[in-house]
């Protein structure tokens, strides 16, 4: 079984083949997801909420992400492994280099950073030094207090254009993947069509190249609240591996996300 790389995902985009991603935080779940064919696993700073019980992702540290990255790495053979860079771990290019290095040494294939134009220098420097970057635009959870809560982004023309411009700039700076979160499907479509690199959506409609969800939402083991853009697949299948297969199949055939999971 060949390993998934950024080149694999680029080929999928060029072929029009949808791919899937999930968060993972330990070897056991990672092994199950990897074995069923999930293409990308993300050690997300969402662990601050779903594992540590915080109200947001801000308390998560680089050491936390590195620990869980090592755990996930030991459980997988095929999936591309991305590690989130947590809040204030990349405020400067120098700080980003130090912390991204630690995450790559922990087993990540790529690091993910939230932000737009202010990140361009950092993205370029990381890429030039052999650290692949996944960018993240739209609802960026580390900026939740700036946004005034977890709110859909890019609904007005000005902000939609800003996000599109930032997506293009991040690709030009060297980003190899882009996550767009909680934006209107029309904006996600424009970004996906404008960029050469693969675009992964969460709460961004069905037109992105790939989809990502938090594993706790997919398996219905969150704290009771499941975001509108997510779906409890365990409820309809009754078994973890079957739930993962159902998620993969619905993304591949275009039935997930449907209109009920999408913002306008």
Swiss-Prot record:
Query: Could you state one GO biological process linked to this protein?
Result: pantothenate biosynthetic process
Its EC number(s): 2.1.2.11
Its localization reads:
Cytoplasm
Q: What does this protein do?
A: Catalyzes the reversible reaction in which hydroxymethyl group from 5,10-methylenetetrahydrofolate is transferred onto alpha-ketoisovalerate to form ketopantoate.
Q: Which NCBIfam families match?
A: panB, PRK00311.1
Q: Which family does it belong to?
A: Belongs to the PanB family.
Instruction: From the Swiss-Prot or TrEMBL record, give the protein name.
Output: 3-methyl-2-oxobutanoate hydroxymethyltransferase
Question: Which species is the source of this protein?
Answer: Shewanella sp. (strain MR-4)
């Amino acid at each position: 079984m060949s390993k998934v790389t950024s080149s694999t995902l680029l080929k999928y985009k060029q072929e029009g083949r949808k791919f899937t991603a999930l968060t993972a935080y330990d070897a056991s779940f990672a092994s199950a997801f990897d074995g069923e064919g999930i293409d990308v696993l993300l050690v997300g700073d969402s662990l601050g909420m779903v594992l540590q019980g915080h109200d947001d992702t801000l308390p998560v540290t680089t050491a936390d992400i590195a620990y869980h990255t090592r755990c996930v790495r030991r459980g997988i053979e095929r999936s591309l492994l991305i590690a989130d860079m947590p809040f204030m771990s990349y405020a400067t290019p120098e700080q980003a280099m130090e912390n991204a290095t630690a995450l790559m040494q922990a087993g990540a294939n790529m690091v993910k950073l939230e932000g737009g134009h202010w990140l361009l220098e950092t993205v370029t420097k990381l890429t030039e030094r052999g650290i692949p970057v996944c960018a993240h635009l739209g609802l960026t959870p580390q900026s939740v207090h700036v946004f005034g809560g977890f709110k859909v982004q890019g609904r007005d023309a000005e902000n939609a254009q800003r996000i599109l411009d930032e997506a293009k700039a991040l690709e030009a700076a060297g980003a190899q993947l882009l996550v767009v979160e909680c934006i209107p499907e029309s904006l996600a479509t424009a970004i996906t069509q404008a960029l050469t690199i693969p675009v992964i959506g969460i709460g961004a409609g069905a037109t992105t190249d790939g989809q990502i969800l938090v594993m706790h939402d997919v398996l219905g083991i969150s704290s009771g609240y499941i975001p509108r853009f997510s779906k409890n697949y365990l409820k309809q299948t009754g078994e973890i591996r079957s739930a993962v297969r159902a998620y993969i199949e619905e993304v591949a055939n275009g039935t997930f996300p449907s209109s009920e999971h999408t913002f306008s």
